[in-house]
Amino acid sequence: KTLFIKKLKKIKKKNVVLLGHMGSGKTLLAKKIARELKIEHYDSDQKIVELEKKSISEIFESRGEKYFRKIEEEVVLNLIQKKNIVVSLGGGSIINKNIRNMIKQSSFSIFLDVNLEKLESRLSKSKNRPLLKNTNILNKLKDLDTQRRKYYLDSDAKLQNTGSISKTYMNFIDILSKINVKNYKFKNKE
């Protein structure tokens, strides 16, 4: 834990933010990182659910995506101002320029990448993904990937999630060990 916190401080980053598509494993990995390093984890979607007292699907249905994105911005900007935490962001939050700018300033960001066909398989079982209702899941994922990938790839590091959270966590530790704290120019794009 101490090495982790020291490295974040030396590169002038307050926390770690996990980015990626819905179903990519951001929350599972963030929980593992938080547990192993004994730091707090926050999930932006869960915070929105707590704040609104409605599920994400219910918010989309009753208030629409525009309202959801407004609340998401407030929640995410508030979360990433905390220190020494891990945050798993909702898949679409990265399209917001204010969120992207705040992440760049304050956080070590990791894009958790997953093959779209694997994502389709994972998400086909889910009933609570409002953007996937009544649509061809793979086509929708391809559309979302086209809109978001350029922002995901602008993260500090990229991790491929092949399915094993333990292996993905070990890859995270490997990435962390490679950060050059004297001259922070780290980019790991696997």
Regions found by a protein language model. Give the residues of each.
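Hydrophobic anchor at the beta1->P-loop junction of P-loop NTPases
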Residues: L18
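ATP-dependent small-molecule kinase phosphotransfer cores
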Residues: D43-S93, K97-K104, R129-P130
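ATP-binding Walker
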Residues: S24
